[in-house]
Amino acid sequence: GMMWNNRYLKANNLPAPKEWIDMADPIYFGHTGMSAPSRSGTTHLTVETLLQGDGFVKGWGKMKSIAANFKTVTARSFGVPDGVNSGDFGVGIVIDFFGLSSIGSGFPVGFVYPTVTTLVPANIGVITNAPNEKNAKLFIDFLLTPEGQEILLDPKIRRLPVNPKTYSKAPKDFPNPFKDSSIGAAVKFDVQLSKGRYNLVNSLFDVMITYRLDDLRAAMSAIYEAEAKLGNKNNPKAKKLIAEARALVAALPITEAKANDAEFNKIFKKKRKKAKDIEKYAGTRQAEVEAEWDKFVIDNYTNAIKKAEEAIKSL
């Protein structure tokens, strides 16, 4: 979902977002943040939820429109709630317990589940040949007891219990997935689909957003300027150029069919924290594909700026 800093929003005269698309509004330019799915499993689930909820092409288009407003892509998932809590940026895309625990800890923040969301269980288990297998099983059993479930309501934890009865002891306004239809699993999450293209989706996000955030922001900033100048004017040429610029930003360097191809996904084995880390696996098929994607993305963002600037000149 989305968490926000109430003081930050008030100081910058910004409304609290309710849906994913709200975060694509130009008013949030430079006021939002998110971690990269390649650095956070929960963030990956958020991205995949958008792709499955809206469809691959439309989902990526929405994701890039949202990302264009980012002030930063944080190095770790914890960096998002930290950024919102401290007021470094106003709104962050997070897993729910980051927002709920911040509220419980007294930070001036809010949190909302957008309509397109999914519920993902947190797993617990005993590893094979565990040195303390008996105690591990006892711990799991304890977590499922009423007392163990109530621990999840602790202000510093704030996870959703699996026992419906536990919610009777939850604080006021605490989300209850068993009763509140607004936080139901709106997306029937396809785990196998997500698993099959996991590394590809992470690489694609990094190439289009993480490593090219400045370029993406520049492209959308130019488009925002053109749209603002156009306003309600009747200028077909400018409208066409702006539409073409937006299409260039939204365009993908890969089809959905290719992204779901099992054999193609096998080439994505390497992870990198920085763009230049691609040098570590230079010569591999993955490096070649990512380089092709990068050229496609840069060319499109650059041409989008040119289209937007041409639109401005025509007004």
Where do the PLM segments sit?
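Mature extracytoplasmic/periplasmic domains
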Residues: I127, N132-L193
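Structural recognition of the beta-strand scaffold that forms the well-ordered cores
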Residues: G1-M3, H31-S35, G90-V94, G110-Y113, ...
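C-terminal structural cap/anchor segments
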Residues: Y167-K237
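Extracytoplasmic ligand-binding site segments that recognize negatively charged/polar headgroups
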Residues: G1-T74, F78-N85
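C-terminal non-catalytic accessory extensions
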Residues: A226-L315
